[in-house]
Amino acid sequence: MTTQEKNGITEGVIWKQLLIFFFPILVGSFFQQLYNTVDSVIVGQFVGKEALSSVGGSAGQIISLVVGFFTGVSTGATVIISQYFGARKKEEIEESLHTAYAFALVGGLVLGIAGIVFAPQMLLWMNTPEELIAESVLYVRVYFSGLIFIFIYNMGAAILRAVGDSKRPLYYLIVCSVVNIVLDLLLILVIPLGVLGAAIATLIAQAVSAVLVTVTLMYRTEGMKLCLSQIRMYKRMLQSILKIGLPAGFEAIMYSISNIIVQVSINNFGVDTMAAWTAYSKIDFIFWMINSAFGISVMTFVGQNYGAGKWDRIRRGTKICLGMALISAVSVSIILMSAERFLFGIFVNDAGVVEIGIRMMNVIAPAYLLFAFIEVFSGALRAQGAVVVSTLITMVGICVLRMIWVTLVAAHGTLEQVIICYPITWAAGALAMSIYYIYKQRKIFQAR
């Protein structure tokens, strides 16, 4: 990909540039979810619902918390590098690249060790059923032993996307998915390692993707190049990255904590409900990967145009992206609800678990379009450096409100009364984020 092609984000037809960038991210997210889903399908069908709950229940929420935090922080690198790239500031691009990589290495090592040490305590705190504790601890510990690979890949992919390269992260995820599927079949079906086999397969696949993205950055000559000897934290760049990334990281933590609290309530309904929730989280991800791809696309688009000083493209690009995100959200809701029984049947063959999953989908799926407002507007605001208020809206309007709802309802509520916290908090967050976005854009464009 040449420099001229990358600059199409600041010069080309807006809807085309958004879609050119969007589709590789979407397909990449699909393959990333594919190897996670393959774990769940193979474990659920060939090991059992208890093993499925061990892989995707409380263990999955813990993993999401840590990985989500770092992914949030990595958006700081995406925004900073995209702005420098749009402004054609080569020295700043190089410094921010090496700072981001150093942060990924240190973060992966420190949090990986912490996860291994504290896995039992975290799972017990989440009211994980006693019969699931041993395998859940095993899965979490193996996963966290390779956390550094996950951090390296996520940061490297974020850097490539920041400069407009969304294709190579896709290619690496395809390779990673193939490796994971082959190892799943080997370590679960041929060598019956159960949950351990699923964890090892994921770890090795993530290591492969980390190596591939690192080699790409080392030998990339257009725009930037990673030199291992220059990996260090430049204070100025670290401050800039963390100024944007930390609020996003804490936002991700709040999402995860609120989801963990929901998971604790789900656990109280028993193993069948836990298995249904795990399966639903895999089906539900179809929406999240599409929505997230729009969020990443608008963040990179706005970031580069912000660096280039093209304010009208920022406004028009955000509107176009929102329209596409809303159409996609409604379409996904209709498709998932039309095929709900078939989709749950892919993961489990227990009729009771399938019925519980259908109840979950009928509550949550109709409200997907609400989150499109939150994803697109927060991405556009973050790309312009406006992170504090948008993060507070998410943390309070969605996460804190969700925790309060579940805490008040969980003791005596039905399953539907617990999980309706998602549509309620999305509605509150969408309204608040839309109001703030309109207010902030008026101020920015009046000042310009």
Name each model feature, range by range:
Residues E11, W15-L34, V38, I62-F69, ...:
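Residue-level signal for short hydrophobic patches within transmembrane helices
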Residues I25, S29, V41, V79, ...:
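Transmembrane alpha-helix boundary and packing residues in multipass membrane permease domains
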Residues V47-Q61, S136, V140, A199, ...:
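Small-residue hotspots at the loop-to-helix junctions and early N-terminal turns
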Residues S74, V142-R161, P169-S177, A198-V213, ...:
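Short runs within selected transmembrane alpha-helices of multi-pass transporters and secretion channels
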Residues L34-S53, L123-E130, L186-V195, I253-K282, ...:
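Helix-terminus/linker motif at the lipid-water interface of multi-pass membrane proteins
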